[in-house]
């Protein structure tokens, strides 16, 4: 079926960069864009009126943990002060002898909820970090039926963590677990890659440099080459990892990966915040950014997650100036790429002390072209003939946004994912008039709330001090209930 989108401001790609075509048209057929321009005279089967709206490429969200909503409340202000804002350690690490937090009791609810929100907020391609470890066939079915373009496979590592009763963090090494996890991921990719009309693709996900042995990382690199897939690893993501690698190998995490021969164009470095020269690392010597740029590896920047902790890249502009390809990810909730673009820009301006830095052009490119480059796809993140028909129609004619001079600036400065009315993936409309097609969102939210409340009730079972949820993360104001 041939579909024509007409009348909006089209963010078109001219083979070099994005440009705006006012009152333009986009034509797509069989999941591919066939025409972008000012007028189209051939017959079409369907017309979508985008008059006075913004039509842009779907966002490529390169780092997502979709099931993490219930745990987000324990990752930010209640973090352990002696762990330098290493947020995931405060919630995901249990006390000795305890089971891991059951935040995946029913991934079909929490995971589905997270992915739905990401899609509604404009993510048409999602890198699901570690997806598929639990009930892999059901997970792939759930992702595939949502109609999103996804890169996924179970993550793996050699290490498990636990806390002593004193709060001391302990690493427990298990080389066999890492080897087994890698093989499970390889088998997963071989089984599921290319399913759902090619929407499901694979990627290897070793967890962190401090939780994977050099041998496991080398085997991961070799497996990726044999499979022809990319790799993403959380790297330079927190100071625990940074100092652990520095003490163990005398290198930064980036130097460690570089010297292993791990870095390359197929590799995405998740977060990649704590580098030489960063104010938190107190290590001015060395040039991690040059190593990344020279290797061709990409960075998945998740600005909101770090802004919550008072941390930022130093800086987005410096990474670009060094030649590093930067993409954007949401990491955890609220999974809104428009918000991530805004935070990326504002955080950069604060770090640089320069209101002209962190341009909206650059952060929009990171959410589209940067993401496409990171996953090795020159048919995504752009609207041009030959590209996949992944696009968004965004309503900027709202009092919350006001008069629109530049639609991209208006979107990033004043808009949000809630302004996205239509999401088209592979030529199919997945979100229409702001509603996810074929899904009762209210019922899903109700089930997710019930699941989250069960998780919160069990927090004391794995917290190293046995604290309840409200003790770990106190309410903003005291709660009073009727007796």
Language model region names:
Residues 1-42, 53-55, 474-479:
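N-terminal metal-binding scaffold of metallo-dependent hydrolase/deaminase domains
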Residues 8, 26, 31, 52, ...:
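Divalent metal-coordination and catalytic microenvironments
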Residues 72-107, 159-176, 239-267, 279, ...:
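Active-site gating loops and adjacent loop-to-helix segments of metal-dependent hydrolytic enzymes
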Residues 74-149, 181-197, 449-454:
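Alpha-helical scaffold segments that flank or form the walls of functional sites
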Residues 140-278:
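Metal-coordinating catalytic core of metallo-dependent amide/deamination hydrolases
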Residues 259-266, 314-398, 413-416:
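His/Asp/Glu-enriched, well-ordered alpha-helical/loop segment
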Residues 388-445:
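C-terminal cap of metal-dependent C-N hydrolases
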């Amino acid at each position: 079926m041939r579909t024509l989108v007409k009348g909006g401001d089209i963010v078109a790609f001219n083979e070099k960069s994005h440009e705006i075509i006012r009152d333009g048209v986009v034509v797509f057929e069989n999941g591919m864009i066939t025409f972008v321009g000012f007028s189209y005279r051939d017959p079409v089967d369907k017309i979508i009126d985008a008059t006075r709206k913004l039509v842009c490429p779907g966002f490529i969200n390169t780092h997502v943990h979709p099931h993490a909503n219930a745990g987000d409340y324990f990752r930010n202000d209640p973090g352990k002060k002696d762990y330098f804002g290493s947020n995931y350690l405060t919630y995901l690490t249990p006390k000795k002898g305890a089971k891991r937090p059951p935040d995946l009791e029913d991934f079909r609810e929490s995971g589905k909820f997270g992915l739905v929100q990401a899609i509604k907020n404009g993510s048409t391609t999602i890198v699901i970090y570690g997806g598929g470890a639990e009930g892999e066939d059901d997970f792939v079915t759930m992702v595939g039926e949502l109609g999103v373009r996804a890169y996924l496979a179970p993550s793996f590592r050699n290490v498990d963590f636990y806390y002593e009763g004193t709060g001391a963090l302990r690493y427990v090494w298990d080389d066999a677990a890492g080897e087994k996890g890698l093989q499970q991921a390889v088998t997963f990719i071989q089984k599921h890659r290319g399913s759902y009309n090619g929407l499901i693709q694979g990627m290897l996900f070793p967890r962190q440099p401090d939780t994977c042995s050099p041998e496991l990382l080398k085997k991961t690199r070799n497996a990726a080459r044999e499979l022809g897939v990319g790799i993403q690893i959380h790297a330079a993501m927190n100071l625990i990892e940074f100092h652990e690698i520095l003490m163990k190998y005398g290198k930064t995490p980036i130097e460690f990966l570089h010297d292993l021969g791990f870095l390359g164009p197929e590799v995405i470095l998740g977060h990649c915040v704590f580098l030489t020269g960063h104010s938190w690392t107190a290590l001015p010597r060395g040039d991690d950014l040059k190593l990344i740029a020279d290797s061709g590896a990409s960075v998945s920047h998740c600005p909101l997650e770090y802004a919550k902790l008072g941390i930022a890249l130093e800086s987005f502009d410096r990474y670009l100036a060094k030649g590093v390809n930067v993409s954007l990810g949401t990491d955890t909730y609220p999974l809104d790429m428009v918000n991530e673009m805004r935070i990326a820009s504002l955080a950069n301006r604060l770090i640089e002390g320069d209101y002209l830095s962190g341009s909206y052009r650059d952060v929009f490119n990171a959410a589209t072209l940067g993401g496409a480059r990171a996953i090795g796809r020159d048919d995504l993140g752009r609207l041009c003939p030959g590209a996949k028909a992944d696009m968004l129609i965004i309503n900027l004619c709202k009092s919350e946004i006001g008069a629109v001079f530049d639609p991209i600036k208006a979107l990033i400065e004043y808009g949000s994912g809630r302004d996205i009315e239509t999401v088209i993936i592979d030529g199919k409309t997945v979100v229409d008039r702001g509603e996810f097609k074929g899904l009762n969102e209210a019922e899903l939210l109700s089930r997710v709330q019930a699941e989250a409340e069960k998780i919160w009730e069990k927090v004391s079972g794995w917290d190293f001090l046995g604290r309840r949820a409200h003790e770990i993360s106190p309410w903003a104001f005291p709660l009073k209930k009727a007796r």
